[in-house]
Structure formats: structure tokens, C-alpha cells
């Protein structure tokens, strides 16, 4: 039998000779990859910030089929340099001022590397106790940094979970609110449930409402006004709720925002939560961008009122040096999530889960499988500490104040909405356009300004519309951005505005 077994083993070895995790080769290739990325960051600001390629460019230059034989890492990286990088919009460029930041850091990258290297699938405590327990710890750490109420922490009966994005956080809490309500009013009343927000709330809520089965007619995006700086008005909220109650509907869920996408305005949480609690709504506070700033004492005021909310989330991958994806969600009542999202098939049953003394994060999210996200957040918190993280945020706020001052010095421009954090909303104002005071024409020249500077590749900015006004958003938050990049960006904007305004004047 021994000789037969040996022959079988030799045959299997010859059939499966590949070892894709040989430690020394992993070490060699890992060094190559780190060198490649270090070189990329050394020269990232030399690339056009926004990719200049045309749709379909990559299919034209890559083979039609996968290679039959192996290729070396060196060959693959050469193609990354010549074929992939030209098609990347460089979010880590110091000249990237569009959307909101996706700030990276050495600690964040290394934590991500370790997480990927371990490659654990932490759906419950048993399959990776450290993954679960570290997530318990870092969400409590972060919650304390934000001075969240103890009821949001594991130590106070609540708890935190790391989701992928705010979209997931909102969906999970909306589903939990829906099911909690329907258990009280009956499952056949789903068509009566109403969701409330402002017209400035992130579109993630509308998508979540669709997925959760909320009737589109029952989605209330309450209009905001320039006079209120585009904040959700508590009186308008209460009027909408009363109207729905009079029509036999069931108010369900309110999403308030700390730092809206369009202008970073902050909804009045104390007054809104007071209204919502009067009518038994679930209140979620979305602080995806601005929440990170609230670790600074001078910004903590914007979270006042969160003590009356049911859930709160922010994206550490935006402005907290933690790589995508890492959305921190805290809930006051974890059982509401668990009742809606738990699954317990036979193949997942285990002694630890049955004790009810451990957290099984699969029951706090939509998916079953989950990554070891806590490692990178732990690395960031330990590598930089609360003090340096506060200074990182304050540095960007200071640069935004400086940029706001530059805009104010040029009489052709105006700031359109108050700057609260590190984003400035501005435009070429009507008085700069001789003979063209029509708002549509003013909007058009601002649209052209945005396209012109983005096409140049020197900087990248994005836009929004506030009260019918086309606005350029200048969001500072890149890890590599300094005051010199901000000054240079303003010069680019001025130069392109000069050309456009001269052209408009000549046309007249």
C-alpha cells in the first residue's frame, strides 16, 4: 500500500505544482510593489489629475483573452505604468479638490495590506475572534473621541460596526426601522411607511428606500432655502409629518445630515430630533464627511443632538486617513439590526454564538462575508494618535479659510454658501459678466470654467447646484495637499476665468 500511496502523491504533486504563496517570492514581489507605489506617490502630482482618456481606451490596448502562460510581476507592473495609470483619476494627487477627499496614509495602507494578507472572512466571532473584538474596541475608541453618548458604545449597551460605505449604513438602519415598525403595525402596512430628509440629503437614502420597499410616493425630500443655508427646517418637517398622519400614513425614518455633500451645511439636530421623537421616528445622523472633524473640540458642537438619535455614521475613508472602504456605524439598539439582518443556518451554528456573549457581525450588515477592516483603523489611530489626527483636520480647515479669503479678494467671484469645514462653494458672480446678468448665462460660464480647468489636468474640481445656482465646489482634504497647492489651484482658476470672461466680453 505504501508504494501505491507514494505513486498517487507523486502524481498529484505533478498535477498541482503551483505554490502561489511561497514566502521568499512573496517577499521579493512585495518589495517590488512597495517600491512601485512609493515612486508613484513621489511623482503623483505630475500626472493630469483627471484622466484624459476616452471611453473604451483600455479594451483597445489589452489582449482579447487572458494569457495561457504566467507573466512576471515586472511585466505586469510595466503595463500598469503604461496602460492603467493613464486611465486613473488621481484621487491622492495634492491637486485633487473634487467631491470629498479619499485621504490615504502609510498607516492606512499598511493596515489594509495586513488585512488582505491575513485574508480572514470574519462573519462571526468564532471564525476570527480578533477581527470581531478589535472592531468592538476601535469603534468604542472612535466613539469616545467623538464624545458620542455612552449608549452608542458597547460599554453602554449600544455598539459600532464597520460597514463598507454610508449607503450600506443607511440601508441597514432603514431596514431595521422598517421591520421594527411593521412588527407593531402589521407587515401589510409597508405601503404606508414614510421616509423624511431634505433635498440636500445624499442620494444614498433614496436608493436605500427603494431597496427597502418604501413606496416612492412616500419619500419626502423637504425643500431647503438659501436663507436657511440649505438646512432642513424642523417646522417644515413637522408639517410634513402631520400631513402624512392626517392621510393615514406612518412616519418611519428621518435622515439628518452633518456636512451635506453640496455645501457641508449642518442640519439642526436638537430641534429635528425633538420633532422626530414626538412622532416615534427612527433618526439616523449621516456625518459621512464632516463627522471626522468632530474629534476636534471646536467642531464637536455640530453633533449636539446626536444623543437623541438612533444611529450615527461617518466615513473614515473620507477625511480620516483610512483607505476605502471604512464606514463607521454606531447604533443605540443593536438588537434592532440583529432582528432584521440575522441568519443562522445549520452550517454556521457554533457554541460561541449560542452563548449570546459574542458579537456576530454578519447580523449587523447586509452581506455574510466581511473583511478585517478594523486593522487599518486601528493602525491609523495608533500611528497618529488623537492629537495628530486633530491637527491633520485643522490643517485642511485652515487651507480652506485661506482659499475662501482668496475668493473674497477677487471681485469677480463670490462665496455662495457659508464655509464650515474644508470646502468652499463659489462661482463667478453676475456682476463680472458685462451685459449678461441672466442666471442661466451666469450658470453656463461657471460650467465652462469647471470644464476648462478640469480639461487642463492641472487641478480637478466638481460642482453642485444650490437654489438654482451652479456652484463650483473646492474641497480640501488630500493627504499630500499643502498651502502651495491651494495657491496654485486658485491661480489656475483665475487664469481660466480671465480667458472665459475675455471671450464673453469680445462676443458682446
Curated annotation (Swiss-Prot):
Gene3D superfamilies: Aspartate Aminotransferase, domain 1, dopa decarboxylase, N-terminal domain, Type I PLP-dependent aspartate aminotransferase-like (Major domain)
Top-level EC class: lyase
Cofactor: pyridoxal 5'-phosphate
GO molecular function terms listed in the Swiss-Prot or TrEMBL record: pyridoxal phosphate binding; tyrosine decarboxylase activity
GO CC list: cytoplasm
Keywords: Decarboxylase, Lyase, Pyridoxal phosphate
E.C. number(s) listed in UniProt: 4.1.1.25
Source superkingdom: Eukaryota
Chemical reaction(s) catalysed: L-tyrosine + H(+) = tyramine + CO2
Example of a GO biological process term: amino acid metabolic process
Pfam families named among the record's database cross-references: Pyridoxal_deC
Record's keyword annotation contains Lyase: yes
Assembly and interaction partners: Homodimer.
Record-stated family: Belongs to the group II decarboxylase family.
Protein name, per record: Tyrosine decarboxylase 4
Organism in which the protein naturally occurs: Petroselinum crispum
